[in-house]
Amino acid sequence: TFLGAHLVPPGADADEYLDEVVGPMLDAVKDHVNWIDVFCERGAFNEEQSRRVLEAGKQAGLGVRVHGNQLGEGPGVKLAVEMGAASVDHVNYLSDEDIKVLAESETVATLLPACDLSTREDLAPGRKLIDAGATVAIASNLNPGTSFTSSMNFCVTTAVLQQRLTLDEAIEAATTGGAKALRRHNVGDGKDPQGRPAKGTLVPGAAADLHILDAE
């Protein structure tokens, strides 16, 4: 994933920086990545700027993703759905309309509980999303600035204890939900459209891509 549009470098103009992102940067990486991403958030990139990034990525043949609604309600979720994004990550602050839009779309809402705890933001409303019918994934968002663990066990446990998911829901979000966020189509019936073993579930014919824990 190419996330060149994460934050504006200190001292730079946002639009001038995006000229670089959608120009020489994208040209340099487009043959080496599958996705383009943008942080659509106050203090980062606004709706118009984010749309510019995603449209450039689409024109380059990339799938699109969005980071958004981490610090407050904003246009990130609706933009993600409008642009056909595979996922929108963070989703801490959602209006009822945001939840409805997600539930009616194929865009996966990715919960990042370790990041939420590290940044002391309100945890994303996983229970409301699932109850509304949205597809949910869980990820670690491991990075040195805002999420300090790679432990999916911790993330799943946090989703259960603090975001009110059932254990089954949390495990499904961390496996099948993640596969759907990667647009691994036909999850669960053995093969993807290219005939490769499906990911994200334990069924006959699926790829044995799994993590077995000796734990109680």
For each predicted feature, which ranges?
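Metal-coordinating catalytic core of metallo-dependent amide/deamination hydrolases
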Residues: T1-P75
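Well-ordered beta-strand positions
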Residues: W35-V38, S87-H90, L210
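Active-site-adjacent C-terminal substructures of enzyme catalytic domains
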Residues: G63-V64, E73-A198, L213-D214
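Loop/turn positions that initiate beta-strands
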Residues: G205-A208
